[in-house]
């Protein structure tokens, strides 16, 4: 905080906050993780690790292959729980801000939200070519906002991938192995963290 002394009360100074500044622990780009709803409590692990890796915000969404279906009441309770986990992870990892965990959205709502971002990455198990993927990632500049779309267990349906491409998404690969939903987002975030902090 940047403060100004307003006066004194006894032996204590009275300060007025002029400006809040973020710690320099933040990534040079705002990265949003769009996560297809996974089974069980996997979302809690995903939120915790994504926050530790520097994500700016998390948008859970229901994909066609999402097994979990949350009504409005359950979605609200989950969002409160996930936000508390994000707060704890941010404090533990020395973050300068607490990432926002959005309320669960439909896939269409998530794509609409992502249209405001500069770059949308869609790791897809049928995509090939690590060189093409690295070219896309290395073209991301500090200050650009980035969205990462991760499917639930079973991945995305081809129609969902097409919809993401129409919204400006770029398909990327995470290698020759098929990763679990809770691993894919962390892998992509790690690659971005390394790339952006190396510029």
Labelled PLM ranges:
Residues 1-23:
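N-terminal positively charged helical leader segments and presequences
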Residues 75-79, 139, 190-191:
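Short, hinge-like loop/turn segments at secondary-structure boundaries
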Residues 10-12, 26-30, 143-145:
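Short connector loops at helix/strand junctions that flank enzyme active sites
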Residues 118-155, 159-160, 169-172:
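Active-site/ligand-binding-proximal alpha/beta "capping" segment
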Residues 18, 22-121:
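RNA substrate-binding interface of SAM-dependent RNA methyltransferases
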Residues 38, 42, 149, 153-157, ...:
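Gly/Ser/Thr-rich beta-alpha loop segments that engage phosphate groups in nucleotides
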Residues 158-199:
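Structured adenosyl-cofactor binding patch, chiefly the S-adenosyl-L-methionine
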